Amino acid sequence: MASEVIVISDHARKEAGTVSVFPVLIHTDYARVIEDVRKVEDQFNSEMKTSIDTKTTADFPELGLAHVTAFTIPYCRPDRLSIMTRLTEITFFNDDYYDDAGVEKILDYNNHLRECFGGRAEDELTKASAVTKSKQLQASVLVEMHYIDSELARDMMLTYNRILEVTSLGKNAGLKSLDEYLPFRIGNSGIEVYQDMSCFGMGVKLTKEEKEKLDPIVIAAHNSTTLINDYHSWPKEVRKYFNEVQATGKADLPVNAVCIFMQTEGLSEQASRQRVREEIIAQQKSHLAMIQDLVEQEGPLPEKYYMYFKAAQYTASGSEYWAAITSRYPTKTELNQPEVIIVDGELKYESSEIQQTPKQIATTFNGIPESAKSIIESKVNGTSAHIPDIRHSPADGAQTHHLISDGQFREVINGHANVHTNGKANGTSQGEDLEVYEVTTGNFQRAPEDTVLAPYQYIASLPSKNIRNKFIDALNLWLGVPPLALSSIKRIVEYLHHSSLMLDDIEDNSTLRRGKPCTHMLYGNAQTINAANYAFVSAFAEVQNLQSPSAITIFIREVQNMHRGQSLDLSWKYHTHCPTVDEYMMMVDNKTGAMFRLCVQLMQAESSVPCQKITQSDFITQLGRYFQIRDDYQNLVSSEYTTQKGFCEDLDEGKISLPLIYTIMDSSPEASVVKGIFHHRLREGGLPLHLKEYILSQMEEKGALSATHSLLQKMQKELIEGLHRVEETFGSKNALVELMLRRLWV
C-alpha cells in the first residue's frame, strides 16, 4: 500500500465544480505512470491501425499531468500502480474502439445487405482479426496480474465473467424510476469489476461472504459513481445520439440518468442534470450512514473493511474530479450544444432553428423478407449467434412439373407457372377412366430450410461461453490462417458442436441445456435428430471450402474418433460398467479431445505458417482431458451447473464420470450399493433427490471429489507448462490462450 497520498484541496475541488462528499486523493507516484500510458497508446494504435486518443490524462492544477487511475486508486501498492494504469488505459481504448465502430453501423447495413443477397461485402473477418489483437493486449495484462496475485486476479475475472453472462447493452425503455435504473446500470457499467481491480491494486482480500455482507453499503457508493459518469458524459452522449440519427435515421435514447429524470419526472434537461448532482450527494451520504450503522451494530470494523469501502469511495470522488477537468468529457458549452427535450421517445433540440427531421438511411429494407431484416438487424447489433443460411435456387431455364391439389399440374419454366387440367373439373371425371399424369423428368424445387434448421437455430441461440471460437482466435495469433479459411473452420466446429449437443441430450435423457429446455423437449426426438444430421452434413460441406487436400481426411478421422469415444461412454452407461481410469482417459481422448484436435489440425493445414508444433506436443491431449474432467467435477459440485442443467444431472443420466469411477472402483459394500442404484435407476426421469444426495455423500466420504479436484489442479499446472513449451517453439507468448485456460480453473 502507498505510504502516503496527496490530498486535493477544497479550493481545487470547488474550482472544478465537484460535489462528492468523499475526499479526493491522488497517488504520490502519479507522474511515474504517464510513460505507461504513452506505451499503451503507441502499442494499441500500432496493432489496431488506429489513431485513438482516450484523453485519460490531463493537466491538473498544482499537479501537472496525471492519469485517472492515480485518482481512483490512490492507495494502490507502488508495485501495482503500473499494471493497474495499463489495464485501465487498455479498457478505455477498447471502449473507444467499439464506440467508434458503432458509428459505422450505417456502413454495416449496406455490407450485410450485400452479404445476405450475394453481393460483395466488406471483409469483416479482417476486422475480427483486429478485435483479437485488442483482446490479446488486454489478456497479456490480465495474465501478468495472475502472476502477481492469482487470488485477487481470479476474483476480478470471476466478476467479469459473471457480468458478461447477464449483461446486455439495454435501453431505458421500461425503466420507470431511478430505483429501477441504478441496479440496471450497476449490472452493465463494469463498476463491480473496477471494485475488484481496486482491491487488486491495494492488496485487499475479502471472502465472498464478506463481500456479500458489505454489498448494500458499497453499492450506494457505486451508484454515485454511475451518476457521476452520467452527468459528465451526457453532452457527449447527446452528440452521439444526433450523429447516429443523422447517419441511420434512428437511435436509442442514451442510457443515462438524465434521460430517466426527463422521462419520469418531466424535468427539463438542465433540471434533470441538477437532480443527478443532488442524487450523487444523497447516495454518498447514504453510503457513509450505512457504515456508521454497521459500526454501531458490530463495533470497530476490520481494517480491510474500511479499505474496501475506500476503494468504492475514491473511485467515485476521483473519477468526478478527473472527469471535471479532462477533455474526454466536453461540456455543452464547449460543444455549442442547445438544450434538448424528449418528444415521443426521441431527443429533439429545443431550439426551433435546429433541424428536426433526420437524414434517412440510404439503404432501405423495402422489399426485403422479414426474416432477412431480422438477420441483418441482429448482425449489425452484434447480438446473433451464427445461424447457417444455405439457400439454393433451381438453375435458370430449368423445367419442373408439380402436382397440385385440384387435379391440375403446374409446369414451372424460368419461374413462370402454366396450369394445365387433367380432364377433370371440380373433382368430377370428364371421361370413363381416371387419367393419371406422371411427373416428367427435370429439376426439382428444394424444400425450404426453415423447418430443418429450427432446432439448430434454437440451440445455437442459447447462452454460451463460446470457448471453441475463442480458442481458435487465440491459436490464430500463431498460425495466421487466412480469414476465409478461419471462418470456415469456425463454422465446421459450430456445426459439429451443436449437432453433438442435440444428440447428446437425447442420448442422455437430459431436460435442461444451459438453463433452458433441451432442443428435443421442444421439437421432439425425431426432428432434433434430423436437424443434428443436417448440421453434420453442413459441416462436411463446409470442409470442401478449405484449400488443404488433407482437410477431408482430418475431418473424417476426428469425427470417427469422436463417435468411437461416445460409443464407449454410452456403452458403459447402458451396461453400468466401471472402466479403469486408463480406459476412461482413452474415451475422453477420443470423445472430447477430437474436437480440439480437429480445430488445431485444420488450422495447421490451412496455416500460412508451415508447422506442426502444436499437435506434436501433448498440450491438446491434456486440454481435452482437462475440459472433460472439469465438466464431470463441476456437474457434481457447481451451483452454476445446477442452475443450467439441474442438480447432479450426470447422476440422473447414469454417466460414468471420473468421480464415480473413483467411488465404485473397489469392492467395498458402499461401492456395491452405488452400483446397484445405477443399475436399477429409472431410464426416464433419473434418480430421486435423496439417492443423488446419498451418492454424492459417498463420493465425499471415499475422497472421490477431493481426488478429482487434486487431479484438476495438477493438470492446471501441467497445462500452463505445456503452453509455455509451445510458446517457446513459436517464439512468442500467447496471453489469450493462457487467459482462456485460467478462466477454466477450479
Curated annotation (Swiss-Prot):
Sites where the protein binds dimethylallyl diphosphate: R513, K591, T592, Q628, N635, K645
GO biological process, one term: alcohol biosynthetic process
Reactions mediated catalytically: isopentenyl diphosphate + (2E,6E)-farnesyl diphosphate = (2E,6E,10E)-geranylgeranyl diphosphate + diphosphate; (2E,6E,10E,14E)-geranylfarnesyl diphosphate = quiannulatene + diphosphate
Co-factor binding comment: Binds 4 Mg(2+) ions per subunit.
Gene Ontology terms for molecular function: geranylgeranyl diphosphate synthase activity; lyase activity; metal ion binding
Region of interest (Sesterterpenoid synthase), ranges: 1-336
Residues binding Mg(2+) 1, per UniProt: D95
Residue ranges, annotated region (Geranylfarnesyl diphosphate synthase): 338-746
Pathway it works in: Secondary metabolite biosynthesis; terpenoid biosynthesis
Key words of the record: Isoprene biosynthesis, Lyase, Magnesium, Metal-binding, Multifunctional enzyme, Transferase
Residues reported in the UniProt entry to bind Mg(2+) 4: D504, D508
Family: In the N-terminal section; belongs to the terpene synthase family. In the C-terminal section; belongs to the FPP/GGPP synthase family.
Entry-linked PANTHER family: GERANYLGERANYL PYROPHOSPHATE SYNTHASE (PTHR12001), THIJ_PFPI FAMILY PROTEIN (AFU_ORTHOLOGUE AFUA_3G01210)-RELATED (PTHR12001:SF72)
Function: Bifunctional sesterterpene synthase; part of the gene cluster that mediates the biosynthesis of the pentacyclic sesterterpene quiannulatic acid.
Protein's name according to its UniProt entry: Quiannulatene synthase
Organism the protein comes from: Emericella variicolor (Aspergillus stellatus)
